[in-house]
Curated annotation (Swiss-Prot):
Pathway this chain belongs to: Amino-acid degradation; L-threonine degradation via oxydo-reductase pathway; glycine from L-threonine: step 1/2
Catalytic residues, chain numbering: 40, 43
InterPro entries: ADH-like_C, ADH-like_N, ADH_Zn_CS, GroES-like_sf, L-Threonine_3-DHase, NAD(P)-bd_dom_sf, PKS_ER, Zn_alcohol_dh
Protein name, entry field: L-threonine 3-dehydrogenase
Any one Pfam family match given in the protein's UniProt record, by short name: ADH_zinc_N
Catalysis performed (reactions): L-threonine + NAD(+) = (2S)-2-amino-3-oxobutanoate + NADH + H(+)
GO biological process terms, semicolon-separated: L-threonine catabolic process to glycine
GO cellular component: cytoplasm
Organism name: Pectobacterium atrosepticum (strain SCRI 1043 / ATCC BAA-672)
Length: 361
């Protein structure tokens, strides 16, 4: 089968002819319709320090996708051939204390699809049936393909009550932008997002941010005055992994504020713990999605009118994967979709014909 893989311990990702994955008794096999490129995939492409320590070579990568079930293991119940599914990318052990207590998102032994085991940049993917999530009929393939990062945004944003609150999001990557959309949708008052990337800040405004702030050009304190904020932010969502952004967040938080952290610093960082202690701040770490409460919330948010469509900015056929990675690596993109439909090759990725418009929904 056709697949994208990390074949060599150097920069790049390559197309290869991979063997079909083997189906276990408790597994399902998914024929992939659409994949999306994650920031993690870019790290793997770049072969940075984290990738060198983490990624086995060679291996098929990718973990954002939607497809249909084409085979079912003999012990599987609840799924049928033809079901349209995405899947939870963290495969848990099922026997550690957290798993047995129903907190599988905190599994001590979780392994990642496309990180520790073969991934979804392939024509076919096999995962445990437990990890599959059936996509409602009124949610498009494109949105379903980005449920993994959308789930990160939902888990982070909905960690705290948002109604009427002032929210600061540091980091306008795709997850930060989707978190901004979630916050506004569920009733936050002001949603301020910060970054230094002008393209993504403009896109964040389209996603619903009250103010998108380029901290290289504006002071966050001036924006707070502009918005009539006198006591600081109630909620902080740290999405950047940048120590300077987190330190700025701590200074901008109101007393008793709550912070959820998804961004991963590249190295250990120091902060002024006095800001945390004397303000009585609550800090929560976020890793992935809650299984499967976050997935049901994702579906409900979209079904209740949350519009994520601006976040998908580029579309390519899988054979044009290099263009997709170039777009992601440029920093001038939102989410990039790779289509596995062979009919898609008849048109360009920006084609506006009726057939392509249908495929893009």
């Amino acid at each position: 089968m056709k697949a994208l893989a990390k074949l060599r311990p150097e920069e790049g990702i390559w197309m290869m002819d991979a063997p079909m994955p083997e189906l276990g008794h408790n597994d399902i096999m998914i024929k992939i319709r659409k994949s999306a490129i994650c920031g993690t995939d870019v790290h793997i492409y770049n072969w940075d320090e984290w990738s060198q320590k983490t990624i086995p070579v060679p291996m098929v990568v990718g973990h954002e996708y939607v497809g249909e079930i084409v085979a079912i293991g003999q012990e599987v119940n609840g799924f049928h051939i033809g079901d349209r599914v995405s899947g939870e990318g963290h495969i848990t052990c099922g026997y550690c204390r957290n798993c047995r207590a129903g907190r599988r998102h905190l599994c001590r032994n979780a392994i990642g699809v496309g990180v520790n085991r073969p991934g979804s940049f392939a024509e076919y993917l096999v995962i445990p049936a437990y990890n599959a999530f059936r996509i409602p009929d009124n949610i498009s393939d494109e949105l379903a393909a980005i449920f993994d990062p959308f789930g990160n945004a939902v888990h982070t944003a909905l960690s705290f009550d948002l109604v009427g609150e002032d929210v600061l999001i540091t980091g306008a990557g795709p997850i930060g932008m989707m978190a901004a959309a979630v916050c506004r949708h569920v009733g936050a008052r002001n949603v301020v997002i910060t970054d230094v990337n002008a393209y993504r800040l403009e896109l964040a405004s389209k996603m619903g941010a009250t103010r998108a702030v380029n901290v290289a050009e504006e002071k966050l304190t001036d924006v707070m005055i502009e918005l009539g904020m006198t006591e600081g932010f109630d909620i902080g969502l740290e999405m950047s992994g940048a120590p300077s952004a987190f330190r700025a967040m701590l200074k901008a938080m109101n007393h008793g504020g709550r912070i959820a952290m998804l961004g991963i610093p590249h190295e250990p960082m120091s902060i002024d713990w006095g800001e945390v202690i004397f303000k009585g701040l609550f800090i929560k770490g976020i890793y992935g999605r809650e299984m499967f409460e976050t997935w049901y919330k994702m579906s409900a948010l979209i079904q209740s009118g949350l519009d994520l469509s601006p976040i998908i900015t580029h579309r390519f056929h899988i054979d044009e994967f290099q263009k997709g990675f170039d777009a992601m690596r440029s920093g001038q993109s939102g989410k990039v979709i790779l289509n596995w439909d062979e009919a898609y090759t008849r048109h360009t990725s920006s084609c506006m014909c009726v057939d392509c418009a249908t495929r893009h929904t």
